[in-house]
């Protein structure tokens, strides 16, 4: 069976840390910021670590060879 390719869209959205955790940009920051709380806007800056089950799914299905 041929080697599974890394999904190009996942390459751009996720990074795998040295310890195997998956980092991604926080959701909900595209528009509609006027009705968001200041705390939400602050917390959604930068990247966040995905929950362990979600991270495992991302790596298994979209990033089989890591990054």
Curated annotation (Swiss-Prot):
Keyword Ribonucleoprotein: yes
InterPro entries, alphabetized: Ribosomal_bL35, Ribosomal_bL35-like, Ribosomal_bL35_CS, Ribosomal_bL35_sf
CC per GO annotation: cytosolic large ribosomal subunit
Example of a GO biological process term: translation
Pfam families according to UniProt: Ribosomal_L35p (PF01632)
Lineage: superkingdom: Bacteria
Keywords for this protein: Ribonucleoprotein, Ribosomal protein
Example GO molecular function: structural constituent of ribosome
Similarity annotation: Belongs to the bacterial ribosomal protein bL35 family.
Protein name in the entry: Large ribosomal subunit protein bL35
Organism: Sinorhizobium fredii (strain NBRC 101917 / NGR234)
Phylogenetic placement of the source organism: Bacteria, Pseudomonadati, Pseudomonadota, Alphaproteobacteria, Hyphomicrobiales
